[in-house]
């Protein structure tokens, strides 16, 4: 948000109490502020439901452990605080729910964090759900790192500058998002979401290979489609598979299930398998 512009309504649980607004949580010497020792997760409340909140609360703890932080908050405590925080907003408000851990101090190795300095907060803020109008994609020149080079098995803040530069480059060429490949040239995901294609009534999605986070919403969509009798194949995809697909759609926590309406110069319409995935997810969320 631009300097001087108000933040949306925000409540954060930090240091044992709820605080309103965009409160400061780090100092200039904080390890996370300059060496990126932070993790987060993102969940959603919309239309009075909070799907898979338990899984998001568990995942932030797993991410913390991966980043050598101490996950000092139980998943049950995260969930209880989340439900308490939701009560501070209008009942029909769409919210983004973001639990976080970060290191306050360096350890004896200086660059490495001190696990005993782990801090945490839970922030909830108003973030309207996006209309299912779809968006355009292209191929990014940037690549996803592997587990040997970055902590891609955690939802770590340090991963997102790579996503950001991919988005900026694609946006400069007139696209809303982009497909990002792994170092072998296979499509991994979009810059901000997991990816699905459909061809001849079969859904395909990149198989988790250690270069992208196997999203909670992704896993939920796969399960729902399979339970409904739809064939979903986790496999290796090249960009040509996207170019020749009957449908392309995305899954992610922020926008849930969304259609892709253009790949490069080729226009696409929201298709039956995208609509099925979205309908199934909404039914699951409201069950």
Regions found by a protein language model. Name each.
Residues 82, 88-100:
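Ordered, amphipathic secondary-structure segments that act as subunit-interaction surfaces
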Residues 1-84, 102, 108-287:
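Helix-start/capping segments and mature chain N-termini
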């Amino acid at each position: 948000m631009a300097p001087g512009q108000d933040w949306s309504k925000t409540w954060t649980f930090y240091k044992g109490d709820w605080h309103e607004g965009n409160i400061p949580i780090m100092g200039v010497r904080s390890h996370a502020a300059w060496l990126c020792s932070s993790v987060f997760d993102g969940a959603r409340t919309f239309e009075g439901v909070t799907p898979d909140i338990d899984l998001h609360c568990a995942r932030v703890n797993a991410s913390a452990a991966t980043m050598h932080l101490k996950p000092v908050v139980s998943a049950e405590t995260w969930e209880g605080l989340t439900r308490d925080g939701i009560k501070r907003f209008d009942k029909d408000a769409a919210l983004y729910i973001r639990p976080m851990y970060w290191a306050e101090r360096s350890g004896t190795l200086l660059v490495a964090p001190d696990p005993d300095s782990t801090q945490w907060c839970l922030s909830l803020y108003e973030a309207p759900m996006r209309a299912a109008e779809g968006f355009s994609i292209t191929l990014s020149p940037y690549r996803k790192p592997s587990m040997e080079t970055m902590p891609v098995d955690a939802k770590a803040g340090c991963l997102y500058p790579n996503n950001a530069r991919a988005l900026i480059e694609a946006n400069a060429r007139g696209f809303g998002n982009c497909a990002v490949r792994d170092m072998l040239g296979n499509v991994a995901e979009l810059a901000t979401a997991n990816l699905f294609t459909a061809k001849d009534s079969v859904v395909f999605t990149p198989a988790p290979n250690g270069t992208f986070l196997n999203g909670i919403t992704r896993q939920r969509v796969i399960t729902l489609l399979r339970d409904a009798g739809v064939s979903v194949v986790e496999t290796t995809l090249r960009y040509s598979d996207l170019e020749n697909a009957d449908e392309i759609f995305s899954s992610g926590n922020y926008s849930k299930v969304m259609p892709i309406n253009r790949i490069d110069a080729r226009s696409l319409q929201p298709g039956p398998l995208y609509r099925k995935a979205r309908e199934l997810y909404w039914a699951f969320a409201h069950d």
